């Protein structure tokens, strides 16, 4: 069977002073800034070009935020262990940003998204080897649970972390993080402002679950346990 391989990447360290803010005022513990973070992500997901027919709306998740806070508090410019990045049945992806000065959350998210300049739709990174993983995670179609946190590690070191569940950046699909087409084309009866609102509560273990399910009709317990999204999430984004 073919297991999913998740790719991770780290943001470059920023030294410039433009866009800096008071760190305490931007705490992700505050409801207003949680909304800012979610709205920024959804605005970027909604505005992708070409448009997406299967892009899910993101929502704040307190467990993902707790995990992100633990990751940020390590004050290490490295991804947290995979086993610490889970929410329920989902494995979660992670974006990390480090700066010498505090930044507004909207600026942090925009910096990740700006890797789009190195992306060619359907091809992937151009030139080859360019960092694009933060952008692709932000626009990964089925990542719909979001939690973020920050840490002041010293007077010249600030870490910002967001976790995304289920994880994006599956290596075999990195060039196509979403399905292009009319907005909400795959969710016409579950659409809010250009984003789908019908996520699947399960995650498949294997990348060839569609073929396995077609062959077995999802009649065996093994298939149901390994391919629950394909077997049970009809009329949902999987």
Swiss-Prot record:
Q: Which domain of life is it from?
A: Eukaryota
Gene3D superfamilies xrefs: CAP (3.40.33.10), Crisp domain (1.10.10.740)
Q: State whether keyword GTP-binding applies.
A: no
**Cellular compartments annotated:** Secreted
Cellular component GO terms, alphabetical: extracellular region
Q: Which SUPFAM superfamilies match?
A: Crisp domain-like, PR-1-like
Task: Kindly give the CDD domains that the UniProt entry links to this protein.
Answer: CAP_CRISP (cd05383)
Which molecular function term from Gene Ontology is one that the record holds? toxin activity
Domain named SCP is located at 38-164
Q: What is its main location?
A: secreted
**To which protein family does this belong?**
Belongs to the CRISP family.
Described by its record, this protein's role is as follows: Blocks contraction of smooth muscle elicited by high potassium-induced depolarization, but does not block caffeine-stimulated contraction. May target voltage-gated calcium channels on smooth muscle.
- Indicate what this protein is called per its UniProt record: Cysteine-rich venom protein 1
Starting at the broadest rank, the lineage of the source organism is:
Eukaryota, Metazoa, Chordata, Craniata, Vertebrata
């Amino acid at each position: 069977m073919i297991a999913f391989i998740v790719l991770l990447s780290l943001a470059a360290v920023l030294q410039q002073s433009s866009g800096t803010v008071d760190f305490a005022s931007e705490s992700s513990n505050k409801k207003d800034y949680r909304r800012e973070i979610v709205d920024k992500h959804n605005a970027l997901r909604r505005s992708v070009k070409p448009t997406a027919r299967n892009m899910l709306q993101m929502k704040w998740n307190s467990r993902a935020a707790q995990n992100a806070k633990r990751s940020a508090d390590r004050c290490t410019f490295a991804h947290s262990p995979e086993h610490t990045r889970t929410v329920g049945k989902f494995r979660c992806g992670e974006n990390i940003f480090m700066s010498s000065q505090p930044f507004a959350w909207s600026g942090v998210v925009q910096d990740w998204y700006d890797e789009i300049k190195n992306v060619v739709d359907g091809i992937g990174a151009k030139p080859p080897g360019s960092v694009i993983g933060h952008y692709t995670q932000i626009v990964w179609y089925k990542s719909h649970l979001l939690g973020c946190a920050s840490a002041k590690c010293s007077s010249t070191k600030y870490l910002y972390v967001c976790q995304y569940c289920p994880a994006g950046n599956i290596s075999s699909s990195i060039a196509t993080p979403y399905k292009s087409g009319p907005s909400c084309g795959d969710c016409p009866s579950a659409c809010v402002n250009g984003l789908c609102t019908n996520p699947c509560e399960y995650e498949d273990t294997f990348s060839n679950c569609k073929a396995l399910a077609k062959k077995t009709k999802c009649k065996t317990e093994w298939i149901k346990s390994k391919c629950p999204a394909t077997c049970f999430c009809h009329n949902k984004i999987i």
